[in-house]
């Protein structure tokens, strides 16, 4: 079975509605760093690391107690993780996705890697408590923190598949998601496992 290489960008990948070649994506990253908002700065910084010639990358956990602790990972391992996620959740080429997580942590980085590798059409927005505030679009695949999911309950009908992780999902939130008939999955993982290792 063919496995994409980390150096390749899927030809169906769209970023905010536009396709970019590898070199064009580097320019987008530079623009994010130079002129973008804070969340775009982190996205640009990650993209430059991902698109460089190295086959490895340093990552920081979403819930790491030590802000300065980073671990070096093989980029192809991240690709394999993205493919596993796509296979498990049935995320496929051309699906729409929303990036609403901070890109300075692994969860936000993985969402962008999934889009580039799986060929998703991903929209980037500033991380906030309610990512669907003033956003009327629908999405096939979204990853959120429990706080975001809680504040977006009335809007989650716009999401075909939702994964919630990065922090404890309370019983109250679990019940609310069930009552709202949201196709949601609680994920558990850590930096060392490259995103989630358990789902329910």
Residue ranges and their predicted role:
Residues 61-62, 97, 112, 142, ...:
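Conserved S/T- and glycine-rich ATP-binding loop of Class I adenylate-forming
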Residues 40-59, 93-96:
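Conserved pre-ATP/AMP-binding loop-to-beta segment of ANL
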Residues 75-80, 96-151:
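AMP-binding/adenylate-forming
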Residues 153-200:
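Gly/Ser/Thr-rich phosphate-binding loop
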């Amino acid at each position: 079975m063919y496995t994409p290489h980390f150096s390749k960008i899927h030809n169906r990948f769209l970023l905010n509605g536009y396709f970019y070649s590898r070199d064009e994506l580097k320019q987008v990253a530079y623009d994010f760093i130079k002129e973008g908002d804070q969340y775009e700065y982190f996205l640009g910084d990650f993209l430059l690391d991902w698109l460089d010639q190295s086959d490895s990358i340093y990552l920081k956990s979403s819930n790491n107690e030590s802000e300065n602790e980073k671990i070096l990972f093989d980029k192809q391992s991240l690709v394999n993780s993205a493919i596993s996620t796509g296979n498990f959740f049935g995320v496929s080429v051309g699906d729409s996705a929303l990036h609403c997580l901070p890109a300075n942590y692994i969860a936000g980085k993985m969402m962008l890697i999934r889009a580039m590798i799986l060929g998703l059409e991903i929209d980037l927005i500033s991380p906030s408590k309610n990512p669907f505030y003033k956003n009327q679009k629908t999405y096939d695949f979204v990853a959120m923190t429990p706080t975001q999911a809680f504040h977006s309950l009335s809007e989650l009908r716009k999401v075909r598949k939702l994964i919630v992780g990065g922090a404890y999902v309370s019983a109250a939130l679990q019940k609310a998601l069930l009552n709202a008939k949201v196709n949601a999955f609680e994920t558990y993982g850590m930096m060392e496992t490259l995103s989630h290792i358990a789902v329910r």
